[in-house]
Amino acid sequence: DTERQRITKLLQNKGYYKFNKDFLVYQADTARNTYLVDLTLRLLPYQRRKEDLPRKHRQYKVGEVNFLADDEIMSVQEGTLEEFDSLRYKGYSMYYKGKAFLRPQVLVDFNRIRPGELYSEQDVQNTYSNLGRLRALKYSNIRFREVNGENGTQLDAYVFLAKNKNKSMAFEVEGTNSAGDLGAAASVSFQHRNVFKGSETFMMKVRGAYEAITGLGVASQDYVNDNYMEYGIESSLNFPQFMFPFLSSNFKKKIRATSEVGLKFTSQVRPEFSRTLASASWSYKWTDRKRMQHRLDLVDVNYVYMPRKSSAFQEYLDSMSLRNSALKASYENQLVVRTGYSFTYNSAGNAMMRTPTKNSYSIRANIEEAGNLLYVASKLVHPNPKDGEDYVLANIPFAQYVKADFDFAKNFMIDPRNSFVFHIGVGVAYPYGNSKMLPFEKRYFSGGANSVRGWSVRSLGPGVYKGSEDGRMDFINQAGDIKLDLNIEYRTHLFWKLNGAAFVEDRKS
């Protein structure tokens, strides 16, 4: 049956619109009186009904391609489209009532059914997939009507488009109780799914929070208030195409890409400190042949500024610096301006979403850099800084480093219930120029569900370091600039949806 499906798919992509696997039958011959069977694959002629005369299978070409902004039409007959306004654009006909809600160029770019070409079922499925990425559409439906053209039988295509609701708003309210301190938070979000009539999605969210803090004690004389306030705003604009100047339209049509610009700002004011967090990003995502995924972060800016820390809070952070360096790192000024690219490949393709049935492997790679353009620009403006001084932007020294990671995993299927998985991961990061060490969140660490699972996150240091005499651990012994992961895991299905695993791991960082 697999061979019949393969041949059917091949013929349907070569213009044979009405072909299906029922026209392919096998004949078995055992007349030679052996243990072998001769199989002959026969092609039956086209016959719609048993009483019809058999005839050759016809090859169809696409005639007209029409887009209709109406999903309620059950069939297209003569005069059906007379009540619609129409527009002719680059050989395609657009029909709509009132105003067109999508630009004609968008429909042409996302369509794969071309007038004058042989009918292809793959082109139809690709068109469905492309239109499904347009958030301005609720759904789409493609129908064909057989007509007699100049060069034989043709198919006119009708692409029906159901408009989605463009605008939506959401309001959220929540109450909090942190160790007896009562508070409340509220947020309002707005989304527009078709800002420029190209299915661009714009989102904006505003959030505010308040909490009354009690029990500040004698240290309260160093505090400016006795409550916690937070407010923030974030927004994003998503394009369903690869938006970049100087790229040809053919390139944009080949890849299923999205482009996104994002901005975020948050201000936090507590008795102990004030903190400002801001970020900006411009990124691209695209897939290739359903197995490969790409992400390009053209620019990704993360900014943390601490304009105020009380002396009591600073003393607390200093006392915790050796016990919990991650806590202290969260309350330090930071500026990272990075560019990165990541690549993911899975040999199973869409099958990875189901229970694996055969051997497969996956590859993940990532490379990023930060601060190089800022460093060059700073050198041009101020070529000779004082000894020991770092270049700054917005009064914060910016990070400068390069980092690369590579992960490979191989899945060996023993049977449908049991498998072995082998994994190796390597990574290296190097700070230089304006940085003497990596930003804390960019360092490698061990422990946790995605690392050596026998230890909790960041609890496993390199080598056999035992810490200081009082048992405290310094951050440099819990994170590193190089990593090496090795993992062998046996997986088995126990019962229902419960799976079990036994693993052996080694990690250096």
Predicted regions and their residues:
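Gram-negative/organellar outer-membrane beta-barrel architecture
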Residues: A100-F101, S120-R364, R453-G454, L460, ...
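Extended beta-sheet lipid-handling architectures
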Residues: T2, K9, F19-K21, A185-F190, ...
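C-terminal outer-membrane beta-barrel translocator/porin domains of Gram-negative envelope proteins
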Residues: T80-E83, Y92, T176-A179, R295-H493, ...
